[in-house]
Swiss-Prot record:
1-deoxy-D-xylulose 5-phosphate binds at residues 46, 51, 111. SUPFAM superfamilies: Pyridoxine 5'-phosphate synthase (SSF63892). Catalyzes the complicated ring closure reaction between the two acyclic compounds 1-deoxy-D-xylulose-5-phosphate (DXP) and 3-amino-2-oxopropyl phosphate (1-amino-acetone-3-phosphate or AAP) to form pyridoxine 5'-phosphate (PNP) and inorganic phosphate. This is Pyridoxine 5'-phosphate synthase. Its EC number is 2.6.99.2. One of its GO terms (biological process) is pyridoxine biosynthetic process. It is found in: Cytoplasm. Homooctamer; tetramer of dimers. The active site is at residues 44, 74, 202. The gene is pdxJ. GO terms for molecular function: pyridoxine 5'-phosphate synthase activity.
Length: 255
């Protein structure tokens, strides 16, 4: 089995929102990614609507269903509704995505930069996971590779974890990836032993993805946005997506 690519289109919305109006069109960009071979589309709507908005989520849900690819909605399950943002649970009720990835990011964070602390996020998180799974969605929890309680995600009811790969990307860029890869491989093995599927995401790129997949067993899906869109500025969107698909074809999921 080949690791699946879910393209995060948040950065398309950032560019659109910086000018106002409808261009670039998030749905058109997502359609181009799917045509180039992406296996799914990811969005992370935030309460401040800095990029993906509620109407984008609805439109992309319709597109992914029509194209028969997976839709993955990321978000903070604890963030309350506010003007223009109905809350993660309500967005998911309206769209029933194939996967919901829960992320503990605060309103002021520039980007997601840490996973759940299972020593604290327990009872309320378990209740929310149950509510999301009642929609028929697969639930994944964003976690740090060094979290000693990764197996706790299974006890809380999650189906998968998403390994936060920012530290790996930083280590790879500085030529010091080996020790970090060992940490991620161990995390993946612990997750697999607990019966959890393994996703990965954050700062993965054409430069570092192949090395990551070669060292970390069982990665079912990678979610890639910032690097892919950045590379698309030079390569074109179609070519950028195809480059990732080629990397994934060169690696196979192993237990």
């Amino acid at each position: 089995m080949t690791t699946q690519l879910s393209v995060n289109v948040n950065k398309i919305a950032v560019l659109r929102n910086s000018r106002g109006g409808a261009d670039p069109d998030v749905v058109q960009a997502a359609r181009a990614c799917i045509a180039a071979g992406a296996h799914g589309i990811t969005v992370h709507p935030r309460p401040d609507q800095r990029h993906i908005r509620a109407d984008d989520v609805l439109a992309l849900s319709a597109l992914t269903r029509a194209q028969a690819v997976e839709f993955n909605i990321e978000g903070n399950p604890f963030a309350p509704p506010r003007a223009g943002y109905p809350g993660l649970l309500e967005l998911c009720r309206a769209t029933r995505p194939q996967q919901i990835t829960l992320v503990p990011d605060g309103d002021g964070q520039l980007t997601s930069d840490h996973g759940f602390d299972f020593a604290q996020d327990t009872t309320q998180l378990a209740e929310l996971i149950t509510a999301f799974k009642q929609l028929g969605s697969r639930v994944s929890l964003f976690v740090d590779a060094g979290n000693p309680d990764i197996a706790r995600a299974a006890a809380l009811g999650a189906d998968r974890i998403e390994l936060y790969t920012g530290p790996y990307a930083h280590a790879h860029a500085s030529g010091q990836a080996d020790a970090t890869l060992a940490l991620f491989a161990d995390a993946a093995q612990r997750a697999s032993a607990a019966g959890l599927g393994i996703n990965a995401g954050h700062d993965l790129s054409q430069a570092n993805l192949g090395d990551f997949l070669a060292a970390v067993p069982g990665v079912l899906e990678v979610s890639i946005g910032h690097a892919l869109i950045s590379e698309a500025l030079y390569q074109g969107l179609d070519a950028s997506v195809r480059a990732y698909v080629d990397i994934l074809r060169g690696s196979h999921v192993s237990a």
